[in-house]
């Protein structure tokens, strides 16, 4: 749904720019442009609106999956989306950090952002999907001849086997996984590493 909204808004912006009156006479007008910015995206659960402190929201493994899917949408649409701002970064809604007294807890969303930072400054890498599994979402990018691939398994009950084929055999460098048996698992002051990214 978000991807469709992005495309619709881009079309509306372009149509609006096209409808603006063109300058007359010998003067050249500066090129008209208008960037699309997505603000305050992320999961907003209804319980947060009654929370004290206000809008405090725990982030679960399920939230991490939707964060990864949303970032992949933005990455696929960099030609249309100039900037996207996560709802909040600390203590509120889809945050990366939660505080509890003297504790600062990294949420599963933090790990997603940490894993995805390799795509900064990279180019989207096109690929062909055969026998697509609707529960697996894939995004790839390339930077300085390094290829980065995201695989997001949206199934909470089933592992998936994915085969990647390259025209030339690449050297495998590393893999990171964010996983939890229970999609409702989260990190807190007593269990700060319940849901954390692991090598392999």
Predicted regions mapped to residue ranges:
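C-terminal beta-sandwich/jelly-roll accessory domains of carbohydrate-active enzymes
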Residues: 128-131, 144, 154-200
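Extended catalytic-interface subdomain
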Residues: 1-23, 32-39, 43-46, 70
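Low-complexity, flexible helical/coil segments
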Residues: 14, 121-123, 184-188
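Short edge beta-strand/loop segments characteristic of extracellular beta-sandwich folds
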Residues: 150-152
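Residue-level signal for alpha-helical context at structural boundaries
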Residues: 20-23, 102, 130-131, 193
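Secondary-structure transition/capping motifs at alpha-helix termini
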Residues: 11-32, 74-81, 119, 169
């Amino acid at each position: 749904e978000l991807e469709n909204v992005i495309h619709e808004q881009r079309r509306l912006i372009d149509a609006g720019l096209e409808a603006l009156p063109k300058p007359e006479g010998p003067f050249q007008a500066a090129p008209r442009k208008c960037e699309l910015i997505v603000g305050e995206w992320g999961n907003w659960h209804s319980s947060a609106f009654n929370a004290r402190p206000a809008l405090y929201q725990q982030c679960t493994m399920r939230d991490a999956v939707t964060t990864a899917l949303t970032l992949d949408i933005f990455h696929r649409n960099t030609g249309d989306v100039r900037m996207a701002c996560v709802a909040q970064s600390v203590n509120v809604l889809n945050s990366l950090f939660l505080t509890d007294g003297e504790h600062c807890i990294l949420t599963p969303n933090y790990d997603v952002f940490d894993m995805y930072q390799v795509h900064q400054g990279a180019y989207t890498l096109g690929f062909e999907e055969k026998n697509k599994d609707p529960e697996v979402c894939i995004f790839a990018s390339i930077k300085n001849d390094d290829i980065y691939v995201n695989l997001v398994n949206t199934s909470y009950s089933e592992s998936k086997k994915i085969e990647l084929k390259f025209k030339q055999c690449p050297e495998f460098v590393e893999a990171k996984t964010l996983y939890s048996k229970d999609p409702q698992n989260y990190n807190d002051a007593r269990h700060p590493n319940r849901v954390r990214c692991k090598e392999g």
